[in-house]
Structures are given as C-alpha cells and as structure tokens.
C-alpha cells in the first residue's frame, strides 16, 4: 500500500493493492461417482478455491480560498476474482465450467436479435426451446452443431454483483452558509430482467402489460394493420412479439424451456449507476443575532436523500439488484429542520 500527504497535508491519499488466494472453501461436492449413491444428497466439504485481486483507496483535499473553505474526499474499491477449484465434473464444453470464471458470473445464450421472417428461421440453426416465429429471439449456435440448446449457454457480460464501488463527497462553507453533497456509485455488474412485469402474459397474468413493453415490442405489418397500430419489424426491437403460446407463457411455469424467456444477452442489463445519496444545505445565523435572543447557535437546514440517480437502466432502481423490479424502491426525501443550541 501507499500512504501520501502533500501540500502541507492539504492532500492526503491511501492506496492498497490486494491479491488473496482462499482455499478450503466449504461447499457442496459437485462431482461424485454415481456408485457412491449420493446423487440427490451430496455432502459438503472444503473443496473450493478462489483467487481475488484488486485495489482500494481514498483521498481528501482541503483548501481555503478567501472566505470559502471546501473539502473534496473520495473512495474507490475494485476487485476481480477467479474460481480456481470447485470440484466440478469435466464438461464436454470447457466454456460451461465454472472453473476459470468469476464468482457470480452471468451465464446465458447469446442473442442475435429477432427473427425477421420465416426465411430467416429456415436458414438459421434449429432452436430447441419450442417452435419459433418471426419476432422471436434468435440465438447464436456457439458450438456449431447446427442446433441451439443448453450446450450453447456461455458466460456473458459481467457478474451479478458490482466489481467496482466508489463514493465522492463535497463540502464547502462560506460565512454562515454550508453545503455538503455525497455521491455513491457502483459499476462492472449486470443482471437479467424477467418476471411478469417484463414478460407479458406470464405467471398467470392476462393483462396489465407495461406501456413500454406494448409500445416497443416487435409486431408484423399484417397484425399492425388489423389492429390499427404502427408496425415494428425491427430485428433489434426492445421486446419480442407478444405470445400466449408455449413459446411465451402457455399453461406451464416460466422456468420451463421456452424460447423467448431464456437467460440471454437480450435480457441482460447494465447495473452501473451514480446516485446523489445526500445533499445538505444549511445556514447558521450570525452571532450578533443569536446573542440577542440568548441562544448559543441557530442553524436552519435542508437535507435531501436519494434525490437523483444516473443510470442507463430506467425501469427501476438499479441499486436494488432485483431482476423482477418488484421490490419497494428507495424513498426520496427532503427534510427541513432547525437546530438550536442553548
């Protein structure tokens, strides 16, 4: 690590690098011969090994310019890990093993957009997740065997947990006025969106489709003309065609094999965000006024919490880390107050 102090301690910083190997991690055995007879109830053992490396740091800068005093401070943590051993059976496809990848690595199919027409379907590898139609999601045949199935599931995107976490604080005073802001953020993470709020007509829902799903779905010209709505045959539309069939929801659970509702890059979203976590603005009355009313100190203040968030993901709060969007969001609040010291 490095510790530094510059400009008569106006600027201070600390940076630490870490490289940790952790072995003997207690976990369920993943690979046991069938002759052992424990396929349905595998024992736990100290068989896992993970290597983690990264850095964390913080800094602070203080300065005074005329009557203005201000402080800037920040912190950052970045980490990346790799699974070295987890007692897993050798897979036909090395890319489907957990070893060599990160903990919480997202996995799924690679989406190539939506099928444009039936010629596109006939000229593409056969997809084994139910019959497909134009407007359904088209996937990449990773292993080149002519079919798309679970053998084409690969590591995609980043991890479901942030690898990067940071914060920034700003504070300043000028005579009786004081302002303080605190930003926080996270990056290097992605998550899948799913559930009835995203997948229309699933989980027993027959209506209440989100407007964004309805307006941005794929819809062919013939259907659009019948319904009197604009057509959208864009192979990169935000949502596939609406469906009641087994390719959509059918009469089975959402966890069974269906083409459009598979974990894939089509439903993978960026979990990065920056949030103005708190802002505090206050004014302390001058001593000559306070003394007249026989108080020691009087401060009027306003505090705001979770007022602004910047993120490419707009459907719900990315900090929740929720794929379904059904958790109660963080509340925004503004508080006005008066602090009096006698």
What residue ranges belong to the model's regions?
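Membrane-spanning beta-strands of outer-membrane beta-barrel proteins
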Residues: 50-52, 163, 274, 331
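Membrane-embedded beta-strands that build the outer-membrane beta-barrel scaffold
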Residues: 2-6, 11-19, 55-63, 70-78, ...
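Extracellular/periplasm-exposed beta-strand and loop segments of Gram-negative cell-envelope proteins
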Residues: 26-32, 41-50, 87, 100, ...
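Outer membrane beta-barrel strand-and-loop segments of large Gram-negative receptors
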Residues: 18-65, 96-104, 108-110, 139, ...
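Active-site-adjacent bridging/hinge elements
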Residues: 27-32, 140-148, 248-258
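Conserved small-residue
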Residues: 64-160, 191, 196-248
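Membrane-interface anchoring segments and C-terminal beta-barrel signals
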Residues: 89, 193, 231-342
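Outer-membrane beta-barrel proteins
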Residues: 22-28, 68-69, 81-87, 188-194, ...
């Amino acid at each position: 690590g490095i510790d530094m102090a510059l400009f008569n301690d106006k600027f201070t910083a600390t940076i630490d690098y870490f490289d940790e190997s952790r072995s003997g991690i207690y976990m369920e055995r993943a690979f046991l011969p069938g002759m052992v007879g424990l396929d349905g109830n595998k024992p736990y053992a100290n068989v896992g090994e993970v290597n983690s490396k990264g850095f964390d740091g913080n800094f602070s800068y203080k300065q005074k310019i005329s009557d203005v005093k201000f402080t800037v401070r920040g912190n950052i943590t970045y980490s990346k890990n790799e699974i070295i051993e987890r007692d897993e059976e050798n897979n036909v496809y090395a890319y489907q093993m957990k070893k060599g990848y990160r903990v919480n690595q997202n996995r799924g199919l690679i989406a190539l957009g939506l099928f444009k027409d039936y010629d596109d379907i006939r000229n593409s590898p056969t997809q084994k997740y139910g019959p497909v139609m134009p407007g359904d999601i088209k996937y990449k045949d990773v292993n080149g065997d002519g079919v798309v199935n679970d053998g084409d599931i690969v590591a995609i995107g980043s991890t479901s947990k942030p690898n990067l976490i940071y914060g920034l604080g700003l504070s300043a005073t000028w005579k009786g006025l004081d302002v303080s802001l605190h930003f926080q953020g996270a990056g290097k993470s992605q998550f899948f969106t799913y559930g009835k709020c995203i997948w229309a007509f699933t989980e027993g829902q027959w209506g209440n489709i989100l407007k964004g799903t309805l307006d941005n779905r794929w819809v062919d010209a013939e259907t659009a003309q019948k319904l009197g709505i604009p057509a959208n045959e864009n192979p990169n539309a935000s949502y596939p065609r609406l469906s009641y069939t087994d390719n959509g929801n059918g009469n089975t659970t959402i966890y069974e094999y269906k083409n459009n509702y598979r974990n894939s890059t089509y439903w993978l979203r960026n979990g990065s965000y920056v949030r103005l976590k708190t802002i505090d603005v206050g004014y302390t009355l001058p001593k000559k006024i306070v003394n007249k009313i026989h108080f020691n100190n009087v401060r009027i203040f306003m505090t705001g919490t979770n007022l602004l968030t910047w993120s490419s993901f707009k459907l719900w709060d990315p900090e929740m880390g929720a794929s379904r969007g059904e958790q109660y969001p963080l509340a925004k609040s503004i508080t006005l107050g008066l602090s009096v010291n006698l």
